Amino acid sequence: MLSSFFLTQHLEAGTDEAGRGCLAGPVTAAAVILPENFESKILNDSKQLSEKTREQLKPIIEALAISFSVTHLDPLIIDEINILNASLKAMQECVLQLNPTPLYIIADGNRPLLSKNSFKKCSGKIFTNREIEILQSIPSSSIIKGDSKYLSIAAASVLAKTYRDEYMNTIHEEFPMYNWKKNKGYPTKEHREAIRKYGVTKYHRMTFRLLPEQTVLDL
């Protein structure tokens, strides 16, 4: 069973991202503050849950959370500052959107979420000095496999995954030949064959190796 809290029982937020390894679409992050009495026998790392279970959990998390937020960062930003920095920035933006501001943050992963070097500038997504001050004033811990250890991170994992899946289902209608409704932008054989046949779209990440034999995709 997942633990409720890491250090404190008051306003501790969990945050996680989805879509880091995809060839197309945004990286999506979520942050969640759960109440002390939140319980769930089925909540776990979103990767361990079926799509049906994730969809069942989404409205429950949204209804019972003290606060939650979701952020998408598009491929242009991913290409500009790289996927690691984009993932951190998406989680940072989610933390800023929480109301009330959490007293502690736990993030899935092994990289410091709020270190001085993590606030990468990029086009259209520059934190103000005040926002950076707010983020740096909140103590945080990054926890490897945190989404399978703590309820708040698992809840964030579910929201990030379900919101990103909805986004990919929407853009699938614009470019159905890539079958994003099924592969969600991940590097499946089918997705790469579609890239080879039809080329790339505005939703593809140009700094990723979109085709295995290419170091840089020919445009």
Swiss-Prot record:
Keyword hit for Repressor: no
Source species, domain of life: Bacteria
Amino-acid positions noted as binding a divalent metal cation in the UniProt annotation, renumbered to this chain: 16-17, 108
PROSITE patterns: RNASE_H_2
KW Cytoplasm (keyword) present: yes
Segments passing through the bilayer: none
Enzyme class, spelled out: hydrolase
GO cellular component terms given for this protein: cytoplasm; ribonuclease H2 complex
Example GO BP: DNA replication, removal of RNA primer
Reaction catalyzed: Endonucleolytic cleavage to 5'-phosphomonoester
EC number: 3.1.26.4
Gene Ontology MF terms: manganese ion binding; RNA binding; RNA-DNA hybrid ribonuclease activity
Keywords: Cytoplasm, Endonuclease, Hydrolase, Manganese, Metal-binding, Nuclease
Places the protein is found: Cytoplasm
Signal peptide (residue range): none
Cofactor notes: Manganese or magnesium. Binds 1 divalent metal ion per monomer in the absence of substrate. May bind a second metal ion after substrate binding.
Domain RNase H type-2: 10-219
Cofactor(s) needed: Mn(2+); Mg(2+)
Function (record text): Endonuclease that specifically degrades the RNA of RNA-DNA hybrids.
Homology family: Belongs to the RNase HII family.
Protein name per Swiss-Prot or TrEMBL: Ribonuclease HII
Phylogenetic lineage: Bacteria, Pseudomonadati, Bacteroidota, Flavobacteriia, Flavobacteriales
